[in-house]
Swiss-Prot record:
One of its GO terms (biological process) is L-tryptophan biosynthetic process. The keyword Chaperone does not apply. It comes from the Bacteria. Pfam families: PRAI (PF00697). It catalyses: N-(5-phospho-beta-D-ribosyl)anthranilate = 1-(2-carboxyphenylamino)-1-deoxy-D-ribulose 5-phosphate. This is N-(5'-phosphoribosyl)anthranilate isomerase.
Length: 206
């Protein structure tokens, strides 16, 4: 079971998550996000993440290919997460030089908003229509992908991770709000530990 901790804004949070076994550490570059990180902080988080064997991920919304590549080159990020549409510009370069996670919105009733075929090797990540809110969609009504590696996000936390994995059998899980201190963007060490350890243990059983 792959675990992605998203919306990381400080190297200490990245370090603790990686030491606990997180596979991906996500940094947000979307302008409107409360978790948006600066380039200097992202570079520090990226260095910490790589040193501990995890993969840093840049999360982008409504940025062009050139903007994404510029940020990745300045920070050392090699995996990017896109949301609901591919960016304008030379997509071929992005697909050639970077690993891609592609977030697909799911309505509250479990229906995929815009079903589409993805290029090979692009990892689909199914999330609520507005990510980072701590809300989930109807897992029981959602039709899980078959014969492909995919990840689940949307309202996950230590209290419901067992139900989520047992219901949908994802290959990876992604969390932000569910492991944060209340009303803050910093991660809670106790929640990080509970979430990551539970996901790893449960993942071995499916």
């Amino acid at each position: 079971m792959k675990v992605k901790i998203c919306g990381v804004t400080h190297p200490e949070d990245a370090e603790y998550a990686a030491l606990l076994g997180a596979d991906y550490i996500g940094m947000i570059f979307a302008e409107k996000s409360k978790r948006k990180t600066s380039l200097s902080m992202a570079k520090s988080i990226t260095n910490t993440t790589k040193r501990l064997g995890a993969e840093p991920v840049g999360v982008f919304v409504e940025q062009t290919t050139d903007q994404i590549i510029a940020i990745c080159e300045q920070t050392g990020i090699k995996t990017v997460q896109l949301h609901n549409s591919f960016p304008s510009g030379s997509l071929e370069k992005l697909l050639r030089d970077y690993s891609i996670i592609y977030a697909i919105s799911v309505r509250e009733n479990g229906d995929v908003c815009h079903p589409q075929s993805l290029p090979p090797k692009v990892i689909p990540l199914y999330d609520t229509e507005k990510g980072g809110t701590g809300k989930q969609f109807n897992w029981k009504a959602f039709s899980s992908p078959r014969d492909t590696f995919w990840m689940l996000a949307g309202g996950l936390n230590p209290a419901n991770i067992e139900e989520a994995i047992a219901t949908l059998h994802p290959n990876g899980v992604d969390v932000a709000t569910g492991v944060e201190f209340p009303n803050k963007t910093r991660k809670d060490p106790d929640l990080l530990k509970a979430f990551i350890q539970s996901a790893k243990i449960l993942g071995e059983k499916i």
